[in-house]
UniProtKB/Swiss-Prot annotation:
SUPFAM superfamilies in alphabetical order: Release factor (SSF75620)
Similarity comment text for this entry: Belongs to the prokaryotic/mitochondrial release factor family.
UniProt KW Protein biosynthesis keyword: yes
InterPro entries per UniProt: PCRF, Pep_chain_release_fac_I, Pep_chain_release_fac_I_sf, Prokaryotic/Mito_RF, RF-1
Bias kind Basic and acidic residues: ranges: 284-296
Species of the source: Shewanella sp. (strain ANA-3)
Sites bearing N5-methylglutamine, chain numbering: Q237
Gene giving rise to this polypeptide: prfA
Protein name as catalogued: Peptide chain release factor 1
Main location (coarse class): cytoplasm
Amino acid sequence: MKESVIRKLEGLLERNEEVLALLGDASVIADQERFRALSKEYSQLEEVVAGFKAYQQAQADLESAKEMLEEDDAEMREMAQEEIKAAKAELERLEAELQILLLPKDPNDDTNAFIEIRAGAGGDEAAIFAGDLFRMYSRYAEANRWQLEIMSSNEGEHGGFKEIIVKVSGEGAYGKLKFESGGHRVQRVPETESQGRVHTSAVTVVVMHEVPEAEAISINPADLKVDTFRSSGAGGQHVNKTDSAIRITHIPTGIVVECQDQRSQHKNRAQAMSVLAARIQAVEDEKRRSAEESTRRSLVASGDRSERVRTYNFPQGRVSEHRINLTLYRLNEVMEGDLDAILGPLMQEHQADLLAALADEQG
């Protein structure tokens, strides 16, 4: 392992001991905000520190085994050779683990997420597939014990959604779901297709992190145009007969958010503002990323048929993840929310990109 990496790990070990001491300090315990921040830092350091201590132990085992090579006893020397081999393999494994643990963390990975699903090319079939993706994400959220809340929806004429925005609340929600951003293409025979021809439709998915209140960007009320209107619905006793739906336009960016799922205008406004903050923050994040790294691959596509991240082929039962050339013949399982088979390899590829960038920086 490089000396610079060792020094960094030693610094983290020292910091871990400092934080542990501070957590036992009465003045820190009395300050709940600081105590929570230090507790979070300690939990983040713990895994790296444990890995580094294991690395140090393996290094000590290797040195000890090398000393045994000086023994006169042939059997002892043979045993030493085996121990050296095992220690080197363990050091290699731990070094790879530590490199990943040292990768820069996205500070938003642990936040809640907003998922926007919009029907693109394909008309009614695109809206129906947008509904299928909503169901897929709902199942995935359920499997991860996350809470899912519909913020806004516009139903399709023949089922599904022209657009739906949901909030997913739970630990690590954004960190996993952020890789879903992009154009999702579906190939299948629509129920209304009498000739049995396969149609291609497109749906856009955009995933944004929630902006915590403490870090909320400042939105000038003068920059907002707020309209109220009557909620639309399928009819019946639950249709809202008052102007409780809200449409907020952020004039400087042109971002428009509508919320009409709640009966209360106040609740719809609060939801619309939280989505608006996330969208504005997403724009700022993208500007920053572009400035920092112009060659970075964007996770967000336009939703056009030609710009896709994933294809779902129903006749073949196939899912193709184009960003990493991954093909799975597990379409039914994926549509039922088994997304880890795709998100796991995507995360590994992302880590590999970060490791390559880190290696370039270190020369």
